[in-house]
Amino acid sequence: MKARIVAADFVQFAHRIRGFAAATLLCISTAALAHHGMGLYDRSKPVELHGVIRGIDFVNPHSYLRFDATGADGKTVAMRCEMRAATLLRRSGWTPEMFVTGAQATVYGFAHRDDPTACYLEDIKIGDAPRMNRNDQFEVTSKTDLSNRPARLPSGEPNISGDWAQEQWVIARGAGGLVPKHLVADVESGKVAVKDIPPSGWGPRPVTFTARGKAEADAFRMWSPEDNPRLRCRPTSIILDWIFDGPVNRITQQKDRIVIDYGLFSFERVIYVNMAAHPKNITPSYAGHSIGHWEGDVLVVDTIGFEPGVLAAPVKHSDQLHVVERFKLDPKAWTLTRDYVAEDPVYFTDKYAGSDTVLVADVPYEPRPCSELTPEFRPNDKP
Protein backbone atom coordinates (compact mmCIF):
# COMPACT_ATOMS: atom_id res chain seq x y z
CA MET A 1 0.00 0.00 0.00
CA LYS A 2 1.22 3.47 -0.85
CA ALA A 3 -0.16 6.81 0.27
CA ARG A 4 0.74 9.83 -1.81
CA ILE A 5 0.68 13.23 -0.13
CA VAL A 6 -0.78 15.90 -2.40
CA ALA A 7 -2.51 19.27 -2.26
CA ALA A 8 -4.53 19.58 0.98
CA ASP A 9 -2.65 16.65 2.55
CA PHE A 10 0.67 18.49 2.26
CA VAL A 11 0.41 20.60 5.41
CA GLN A 12 -1.02 17.82 7.56
CA PHE A 13 1.71 15.40 6.49
CA ALA A 14 4.53 17.89 6.85
CA HIS A 15 3.53 18.71 10.42
CA ARG A 16 4.15 15.07 11.32
CA ILE A 17 7.77 15.29 10.19
CA ARG A 18 10.49 16.78 12.32
CA GLY A 19 11.71 20.22 11.36
CA PHE A 20 14.90 20.45 9.38
CA ALA A 21 17.72 22.68 10.65
CA ALA A 22 19.25 24.80 7.91
CA ALA A 23 22.53 23.36 6.74
CA THR A 24 24.58 23.27 3.60
CA LEU A 25 24.52 19.70 2.36
CA LEU A 26 27.65 18.00 1.14
CA CYS A 27 27.21 16.81 -2.43
CA ILE A 28 27.72 13.13 -3.04
CA SER A 29 29.91 13.28 -6.13
CA THR A 30 31.12 15.36 -9.00
CA ALA A 31 28.63 13.57 -11.22
CA ALA A 32 25.77 14.54 -8.93
CA LEU A 33 26.89 18.15 -9.07
CA ALA A 34 27.02 18.00 -12.83
CA HIS A 35 23.45 16.84 -13.09
CA HIS A 36 22.02 19.31 -10.60
CA GLY A 37 23.83 22.20 -12.20
CA MET A 38 25.49 23.54 -9.03
CA GLY A 39 28.12 25.09 -11.29
CA LEU A 40 25.52 27.76 -12.04
CA TYR A 41 24.93 28.57 -8.37
CA ASP A 42 27.05 29.97 -5.56
CA ARG A 43 26.82 28.08 -2.26
CA SER A 44 28.52 30.96 -0.50
CA LYS A 45 25.47 33.12 -1.24
CA PRO A 46 22.38 31.68 0.50
CA VAL A 47 19.03 33.24 -0.31
CA GLU A 48 15.67 33.33 1.48
CA LEU A 49 12.77 34.28 -0.77
CA HIS A 50 9.21 35.04 0.35
CA GLY A 51 6.35 35.15 -2.10
CA VAL A 52 3.71 33.29 -4.07
CA ILE A 53 3.89 30.12 -6.14
CA ARG A 54 3.06 30.64 -9.82
CA GLY A 55 3.49 27.03 -10.90
CA ILE A 56 5.96 24.22 -11.41
CA ASP A 57 7.57 22.68 -14.48
CA PHE A 58 7.73 19.01 -13.52
CA VAL A 59 10.26 17.74 -16.07
CA ASN A 60 13.61 15.95 -16.53
CA PRO A 61 16.47 16.60 -16.01
CA HIS A 62 15.64 19.61 -13.79
CA SER A 63 12.24 20.67 -12.49
CA TYR A 64 11.66 24.38 -11.90
CA LEU A 65 9.47 26.16 -9.36
CA ARG A 66 8.05 29.37 -10.81
CA PHE A 67 7.80 31.83 -7.96
CA ASP A 68 6.92 35.52 -7.48
CA ALA A 69 9.29 36.75 -4.77
CA THR A 70 8.62 39.97 -2.90
CA GLY A 71 11.70 42.02 -2.05
CA ALA A 72 12.33 44.33 0.91
CA ASP A 73 11.25 47.24 -1.30
CA GLY A 74 7.87 45.60 -1.91
CA LYS A 75 8.60 44.91 -5.56
CA THR A 76 7.85 41.50 -7.07
CA VAL A 77 10.44 39.53 -9.01
CA ALA A 78 9.52 36.50 -11.13
CA MET A 79 11.97 33.77 -10.09
CA ARG A 80 12.80 30.33 -11.41
CA CYS A 81 14.21 27.97 -8.78
CA GLU A 82 15.83 24.69 -9.79
CA MET A 83 14.65 21.42 -8.24
CA ARG A 84 15.36 17.74 -8.83
CA ALA A 85 14.36 15.77 -11.92
CA ALA A 86 10.67 14.87 -12.16
CA THR A 87 11.51 11.16 -12.15
CA LEU A 88 13.31 11.51 -8.82
CA LEU A 89 10.67 13.75 -7.28
CA ARG A 90 8.04 11.20 -8.23
CA ARG A 91 9.96 8.42 -6.46
CA SER A 92 9.94 10.55 -3.31
CA GLY A 93 6.20 11.21 -3.57
CA TRP A 94 6.40 14.79 -4.83
CA THR A 95 3.66 15.78 -7.29
CA PRO A 96 2.83 18.95 -9.22
CA GLU A 97 -0.38 19.24 -7.17
CA MET A 98 1.65 20.10 -4.07
CA PHE A 99 2.58 23.45 -5.58
CA VAL A 100 -0.78 25.20 -5.65
CA THR A 101 -0.81 28.37 -7.71
CA GLY A 102 -1.21 31.35 -5.41
CA ALA A 103 0.03 29.59 -2.27
CA GLN A 104 2.31 31.56 0.02
CA ALA A 105 5.76 30.02 0.29
CA THR A 106 9.32 30.62 1.40
CA VAL A 107 12.22 29.28 -0.65
CA TYR A 108 15.64 28.72 0.90
CA GLY A 109 18.53 28.09 -1.42
CA PHE A 110 21.48 29.61 -3.22
CA ALA A 111 21.84 32.48 -5.65
CA HIS A 112 22.62 32.06 -9.33
CA ARG A 113 26.11 33.26 -10.20
CA ASP A 114 24.88 35.52 -13.00
CA ASP A 115 21.07 35.62 -13.11
CA PRO A 116 19.35 37.45 -10.20
CA THR A 117 16.01 35.89 -11.20
CA ALA A 118 17.19 32.29 -10.68
CA CYS A 119 18.05 30.19 -7.62
CA TYR A 120 18.84 26.67 -6.49
CA LEU A 121 16.04 25.41 -4.25
CA GLU A 122 17.46 23.63 -1.19
CA ASP A 123 14.42 23.85 1.14
CA ILE A 124 10.85 25.07 0.81
CA LYS A 125 8.10 26.02 3.28
CA ILE A 126 4.57 26.16 1.87
CA GLY A 127 1.88 27.83 3.96
CA ASP A 128 1.94 26.65 7.57
CA ALA A 129 3.89 23.48 6.81
CA PRO A 130 7.38 23.02 8.26
CA ARG A 131 10.41 23.66 6.12
CA MET A 132 11.22 20.67 3.91
CA ASN A 133 14.42 19.75 2.07
CA ARG A 134 14.55 19.03 -1.67
CA ASN A 135 15.46 15.38 -0.92
CA ASP A 136 12.75 14.73 1.67
CA GLN A 137 10.22 11.94 1.24
CA PHE A 138 6.54 12.86 0.81
CA GLU A 139 5.15 9.37 0.68
CA VAL A 140 4.75 6.48 3.06
CA THR A 141 5.43 3.20 1.27
CA SER A 142 5.15 -0.25 2.75
CA LYS A 143 7.56 -2.93 1.59
CA THR A 144 6.73 -4.22 -1.88
CA ASP A 145 4.99 -7.60 -1.75
CA LEU A 146 7.19 -9.97 -3.72
CA SER A 147 5.74 -13.20 -2.36
CA ASN A 148 4.00 -14.07 -5.63
CA ARG A 149 6.80 -12.96 -7.94
CA PRO A 150 8.27 -16.03 -9.72
CA ALA A 151 12.05 -16.34 -9.47
CA ARG A 152 12.22 -17.88 -12.94
CA LEU A 153 10.42 -17.58 -16.23
CA PRO A 154 8.62 -20.64 -17.66
CA SER A 155 11.64 -21.05 -19.97
CA GLY A 156 13.93 -21.41 -16.94
CA GLU A 157 15.87 -18.15 -17.03
CA PRO A 158 16.00 -15.95 -13.92
CA ASN A 159 13.11 -13.51 -13.89
CA ILE A 160 14.81 -10.13 -14.24
CA SER A 161 11.82 -8.57 -15.99
CA GLY A 162 10.17 -5.62 -14.31
CA ASP A 163 10.98 -2.20 -12.94
CA TRP A 164 14.28 -1.64 -11.13
CA ALA A 165 15.90 1.28 -9.35
CA GLN A 166 18.85 1.96 -7.10
CA GLU A 167 17.92 2.51 -3.47
CA GLN A 168 17.04 6.15 -2.85
CA TRP A 169 19.56 8.41 -1.14
CA VAL A 170 17.69 10.64 1.29
CA ILE A 171 18.29 13.17 4.06
CA ALA A 172 19.62 11.92 7.40
CA ARG A 173 18.72 14.75 9.73
CA GLY A 174 21.60 16.20 11.67
CA ALA A 175 24.14 14.29 9.56
CA GLY A 176 24.60 16.98 6.91
CA GLY A 177 24.21 14.73 3.90
CA LEU A 178 22.37 12.09 1.91
CA VAL A 179 22.47 8.41 2.83
CA PRO A 180 20.85 5.19 1.54
CA LYS A 181 17.26 5.06 2.71
CA HIS A 182 17.70 1.89 4.79
CA LEU A 183 20.49 3.54 6.81
CA VAL A 184 18.65 6.72 7.81
CA ALA A 185 17.69 5.51 11.30
CA ASP A 186 21.19 4.19 12.01
CA VAL A 187 22.82 7.43 10.86
CA GLU A 188 20.43 9.63 12.83
CA SER A 189 21.00 7.56 15.97
CA GLY A 190 24.77 7.72 15.56
CA LYS A 191 25.12 3.98 15.03
CA VAL A 192 26.57 4.52 11.54
CA ALA A 193 28.78 7.45 10.49
CA VAL A 194 28.22 9.09 7.12
CA LYS A 195 31.93 8.79 6.35
CA ASP A 196 31.68 5.00 6.62
CA ILE A 197 28.94 4.68 3.99
CA PRO A 198 30.16 3.54 0.54
CA PRO A 199 29.63 6.11 -2.23
CA SER A 200 26.56 5.99 -4.45
CA GLY A 201 28.57 4.96 -7.51
CA TRP A 202 27.37 7.95 -9.53
CA GLY A 203 30.84 9.33 -10.18
CA PRO A 204 33.56 8.15 -12.56
CA ARG A 205 35.50 4.99 -11.72
CA PRO A 206 39.29 5.04 -11.18
CA VAL A 207 41.14 4.51 -14.44
CA THR A 208 44.64 5.01 -15.87
CA PHE A 209 44.47 7.39 -18.81
CA THR A 210 46.45 7.39 -22.00
CA ALA A 211 48.05 10.74 -22.84
CA ARG A 212 45.02 11.60 -24.94
CA GLY A 213 42.60 10.44 -22.26
CA LYS A 214 44.25 12.59 -19.61
CA ALA A 215 44.45 15.66 -21.84
CA GLU A 216 40.76 15.46 -22.74
CA ALA A 217 39.68 14.76 -19.15
CA ASP A 218 41.69 17.76 -17.95
CA ALA A 219 40.09 19.95 -20.62
CA PHE A 220 36.56 18.65 -19.99
CA ARG A 221 34.12 21.47 -19.17
CA MET A 222 31.67 20.02 -16.68
CA TRP A 223 29.11 22.81 -17.12
CA SER A 224 29.28 23.03 -20.92
CA PRO A 225 26.51 21.40 -23.00
CA GLU A 226 29.11 20.93 -25.72
CA ASP A 227 31.15 18.63 -23.45
CA ASN A 228 28.60 17.21 -21.01
CA PRO A 229 25.80 15.33 -22.82
CA ARG A 230 23.45 15.50 -19.84
CA LEU A 231 23.27 19.27 -20.27
CA ARG A 232 21.89 18.92 -23.79
CA CYS A 233 19.31 16.24 -22.97
CA ARG A 234 21.48 13.36 -24.10
CA PRO A 235 22.26 10.21 -22.12
CA THR A 236 25.83 9.75 -20.93
CA SER A 237 26.54 6.02 -21.15
CA ILE A 238 24.94 2.62 -20.65
CA ILE A 239 27.13 2.28 -17.55
CA LEU A 240 26.30 5.56 -15.81
CA ASP A 241 22.66 5.96 -16.82
CA TRP A 242 21.62 2.65 -15.29
CA ILE A 243 21.92 4.10 -11.76
CA PHE A 244 22.87 7.79 -11.89
CA ASP A 245 20.43 9.83 -9.79
CA GLY A 246 18.21 6.83 -9.05
CA PRO A 247 16.03 6.46 -12.16
CA VAL A 248 13.41 3.72 -12.54
CA ASN A 249 14.40 1.43 -15.42
CA ARG A 250 12.35 -1.36 -17.00
CA ILE A 251 13.60 -4.74 -18.23
CA THR A 252 11.44 -6.83 -20.57
CA GLN A 253 12.54 -10.38 -21.40
CA GLN A 254 11.39 -11.61 -24.80
CA LYS A 255 12.12 -14.77 -26.76
CA ASP A 256 15.16 -13.54 -28.65
CA ARG A 257 15.96 -10.26 -26.94
CA ILE A 258 15.96 -8.35 -23.69
CA VAL A 259 14.82 -4.73 -23.81
CA ILE A 260 15.96 -2.15 -21.27
CA ASP A 261 14.05 1.11 -21.04
CA TYR A 262 16.14 3.66 -19.16
CA GLY A 263 14.09 5.96 -16.97
CA LEU A 264 15.80 9.33 -16.81
CA PHE A 265 16.07 10.05 -20.51
CA SER A 266 13.51 7.52 -21.76
CA PHE A 267 15.67 5.68 -24.28
CA GLU A 268 15.55 2.02 -25.27
CA ARG A 269 18.40 -0.48 -25.42
CA VAL A 270 18.07 -3.92 -27.02
CA ILE A 271 20.18 -6.92 -26.00
CA TYR A 272 20.05 -9.67 -28.62
CA VAL A 273 20.03 -12.99 -26.76
CA ASN A 274 21.92 -16.01 -28.10
CA MET A 275 23.26 -14.14 -31.14
CA ALA A 276 26.64 -15.81 -31.68
CA ALA A 277 28.52 -12.68 -32.75
CA HIS A 278 28.04 -9.00 -33.48
CA PRO A 279 27.22 -8.17 -37.11
CA LYS A 280 30.12 -6.84 -39.16
CA ASN A 281 28.51 -3.58 -40.21
CA ILE A 282 27.25 -1.85 -37.07
CA THR A 283 26.00 1.72 -37.26
CA PRO A 284 27.70 3.44 -34.29
CA SER A 285 25.26 4.68 -31.66
CA TYR A 286 25.11 5.92 -28.10
CA ALA A 287 24.10 2.49 -26.73
CA GLY A 288 26.15 0.40 -29.16
CA HIS A 289 25.20 -3.12 -30.21
CA SER A 290 24.58 -5.60 -27.39
CA ILE A 291 24.49 -9.39 -27.49
CA GLY A 292 23.81 -11.52 -24.44
CA HIS A 293 23.81 -15.09 -23.23
CA TRP A 294 23.21 -16.89 -19.95
CA GLU A 295 26.12 -18.46 -18.09
CA GLY A 296 24.14 -20.41 -15.55
CA ASP A 297 22.04 -17.77 -13.81
CA VAL A 298 24.23 -14.85 -14.89
CA LEU A 299 23.29 -12.75 -17.91
CA VAL A 300 26.49 -11.78 -19.74
CA VAL A 301 26.14 -8.83 -22.12
CA ASP A 302 28.83 -7.85 -24.62
CA THR A 303 28.55 -4.43 -26.27
CA ILE A 304 30.56 -2.75 -29.05
CA GLY A 305 29.67 -0.33 -31.85
CA PHE A 306 29.63 2.87 -29.84
CA GLU A 307 29.85 6.36 -31.19
CA PRO A 308 32.51 8.45 -29.38
CA GLY A 309 31.16 9.88 -26.14
CA VAL A 310 31.45 10.09 -22.36
CA LEU A 311 31.50 7.19 -19.89
CA ALA A 312 31.10 9.40 -16.82
CA ALA A 313 32.25 12.99 -16.87
CA PRO A 314 35.11 13.73 -17.37
CA VAL A 315 36.09 10.25 -18.65
CA LYS A 316 35.60 10.07 -22.42
CA HIS A 317 35.58 7.09 -24.77
CA SER A 318 36.15 6.39 -28.46
CA ASP A 319 34.40 4.18 -31.01
CA GLN A 320 36.70 1.37 -29.83
CA LEU A 321 34.93 1.12 -26.47
CA HIS A 322 34.11 -2.46 -25.46
CA VAL A 323 31.82 -3.11 -22.48
CA VAL A 324 31.01 -6.41 -20.77
CA GLU A 325 28.24 -6.49 -18.14
CA ARG A 326 27.23 -9.39 -15.90
CA PHE A 327 23.74 -9.24 -14.36
CA LYS A 328 22.94 -11.57 -11.44
CA LEU A 329 19.58 -11.82 -9.66
CA ASP A 330 19.29 -12.57 -5.95
CA PRO A 331 15.76 -14.04 -5.76
CA LYS A 332 15.76 -13.97 -1.95
CA ALA A 333 16.56 -10.28 -1.55
CA TRP A 334 15.14 -9.42 -4.99
CA THR A 335 18.17 -7.39 -5.96
CA LEU A 336 19.86 -7.27 -9.35
CA THR A 337 23.63 -6.78 -9.25
CA ARG A 338 25.60 -5.69 -12.28
CA ASP A 339 29.37 -6.03 -12.61
CA TYR A 340 30.86 -4.21 -15.57
CA VAL A 341 34.22 -3.82 -17.30
CA ALA A 342 34.95 -1.31 -20.05
CA GLU A 343 38.06 -1.18 -22.22
CA ASP A 344 39.13 1.53 -24.65
CA PRO A 345 42.76 1.62 -25.85
CA VAL A 346 42.36 5.19 -27.09
CA TYR A 347 41.50 6.71 -23.70
CA PHE A 348 42.74 4.39 -20.93
CA THR A 349 45.36 1.70 -20.47
CA ASP A 350 43.62 -0.47 -17.89
CA LYS A 351 40.02 -1.46 -17.26
CA TYR A 352 37.21 0.86 -16.22
CA ALA A 353 35.36 -1.44 -13.83
CA GLY A 354 32.69 -1.32 -11.19
CA SER A 355 29.57 -2.85 -9.70
CA ASP A 356 26.12 -1.65 -8.70
CA THR A 357 22.90 -3.06 -7.31
CA VAL A 358 19.28 -2.16 -7.98
CA LEU A 359 16.09 -3.16 -6.18
CA VAL A 360 12.56 -3.82 -7.35
CA ALA A 361 11.38 -0.25 -7.93
CA ASP A 362 9.20 1.54 -5.39
CA VAL A 363 7.18 3.22 -8.17
CA PRO A 364 6.44 2.04 -11.72
CA TYR A 365 8.59 2.96 -14.69
CA GLU A 366 7.17 5.99 -16.46
CA PRO A 367 8.43 7.33 -19.80
CA ARG A 368 9.37 10.95 -19.26
CA PRO A 369 11.49 12.45 -22.06
CA CYS A 370 14.06 15.11 -21.31
CA SER A 371 12.96 18.73 -21.47
CA GLU A 372 15.86 20.99 -20.56
CA LEU A 373 14.53 24.35 -19.39
CA THR A 374 17.78 25.80 -18.05
CA PRO A 375 18.51 28.78 -20.34
CA GLU A 376 22.27 28.41 -19.87
CA PHE A 377 22.05 24.93 -21.37
CA ARG A 378 19.87 26.03 -24.32
CA PRO A 379 22.24 28.21 -26.36
CA ASN A 380 19.95 28.15 -29.39
CA ASP A 381 17.27 29.95 -27.36
CA LYS A 382 19.51 32.90 -26.56
CA PRO A 383 19.11 36.07 -28.64
Segments (PLM) and residue ranges:
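Bacterial N-terminal signal peptides that target proteins for export
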Residues: 2-21
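Boundary at the C-terminal end of the N-terminal hydrophobic targeting segment
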Residues: 32-34
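PEST-like low-complexity, intrinsically disordered acidic/proline/serine-rich tracts
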Residues: 36-383
